[in-house]
Amino acid sequence: MARWPAPPPPPPPPPPLAAPPPPGASAKGPPARKLLFMCTLSLSVTYLCYSLLGGSGSLQFPLALQESPGAAAEPPPSPPPPSLLPTPVRLGAPSQPPAPPPLDNASHGEPPEPPEQPAAPGTDGWGLPSGGGGAQDAWLRTPLAPSEMITAQSALPEREAQESSTTDEDLAGRRAANGSSERGGAVSTPDYGEKKLPQALIIGVKKGGTRALLEAIRVHPDVRAVGVEPHFFDRNYEKGLEWYRNVMPKTLDGQITMEKTPSYFVTNEAPKRIHSMAKDIKLIVVVRNPVTRAISDYTQTLSKKPEIPTFEVLAFKNRTLGLIDASWSAIRIGIYALHLENWLQYFPLSQILFVSGERLIVDPAGEMAKVQDFLGLKRVVTEKHFYFNKTKGFPCLKKPEDSSAPRCLGKSKGRTHPRIDPDVIHRLRKFYKPFNLMFYQMTGQDFQWEQEEGDK
């Protein structure tokens, strides 16, 4: 068995100081020992330098040291340009994909790309509309990793829906506006804008001509009105003003919101409730001869309930004594002075316009001129918008810009009244006369209901 060679003997101790060599002897030490010391020192220093460089992780050996001895040595690779270096990532910051390397156009004989231009005004770095700053917009303007981009794109529609003020109704209204359609003889305003509480109300009276007035005023382009009767101040007041506002149509700046509910005029709580909503609101009352109004009211009820008693029976508490039953709604509504007194406790007379139901039939353009002046509107609705229907005895609306047939009120308007005993009509005239005169004095208008020829 081979044996390991014995370790070399320890170096001899340094020689003691000796006396100077005798004359004629050499001053140099042994050459072998000096050469060994220099080689050992050189290797130790070289090893120490490579160890220090290798521990830093930045040591790259030249290719000449890795290739075969016969290969030509190549210079070390040049450091990459700054655009190719990975972006430093800060701990806790969202990861971002490295920017793609720029095309080296110069190497292909092309001019270099111009510097990146700033985003267009109103957009962010992604070409998305800018919301005007804030954390959310800064988040959207931050370049995202592919996985984060999916999340951002899925969340973007929800963000846009929350910030956008355009609704489906607005878009539908704009599409309708492009067609500039008209419905029912009235100009159809596009269904976008803002829902507002009304600035004017048609508060009465039932069977006085309120529907005819509403349909005529809706022809005006600066008026938007509810087609149905909301009955907010008498039946639905507990639902609140927001419910009432949502019932209203959308209006643009400069347009007036209106509604009509004839029962307001005879509702005791209505004046106070309306005043609490808007002190400066404008009120319109269409009044009619109370006798013919009562007969028309009864005729409407009779068409729905044929089994009710006759008009003569319902109008009197005691016909023999000639006692009129003022508690019957058909009679009570016609006591205009009594109801107006309640309204004047909350509104000045200057905020109330009284329209004659009789003149609205024979001269609709004249009465509509008063209404438009009262509302502060330009006189757009004129005689060219009306056509008198001799069969019904009522004016009908027409569109002056085309040749379509005039639009008349429903079949219930102009229905034949039942024949009423002339004695009952005479007694009713006597009953209403003092109230009518009081009403004339309160309003400053003489409606001339006491003339015999005015009662039919």
UniProtKB/Swiss-Prot annotation:
Transmembrane segments: 35-59
Main location class: Golgi
Membrane topology label: Single-pass type II membrane protein
Sequence positions that bind 3'-phosphoadenylyl sulfate: 207-211, 288, 296, 413-417
Keywords: Disulfide bond, Glycoprotein, Golgi apparatus, Membrane, Signal-anchor, Transferase, Transmembrane, Transmembrane helix
Catalyzed reaction equations: alpha-D-glucosaminyl-[heparan sulfate](n) + 3'-phosphoadenylyl sulfate = 3-sulfo-alpha-D-glucosaminyl-[heparan sulfate](n) + adenosine 3',5'-bisphosphate + H(+)
Composition-biased stretches (Pro residues): 1-24, 74-85
Compartmental location: Golgi apparatus membrane
Expression by tissue: Brain-specific.
Pfam families in alphabetical order: Sulfotransfer_1
Cystine residue pairs: 396-408
Gly residues bias: start-end ranges: 124-135
Positions that bind substrate: 229-235, 260-263, 328-329
EC number: 2.8.2.23
GO MF terms held by the record: [heparan sulfate]-glucosamine 3-sulfotransferase activity
Gene Ontology, cellular component aspect: Golgi membrane
Family: Belongs to the sulfotransferase 1 family.
Listed name of the protein: Heparan sulfate glucosamine 3-O-sulfotransferase 4
Species per Swiss-Prot/TrEMBL record: Homo sapiens (Human)
Gene: HS3ST4
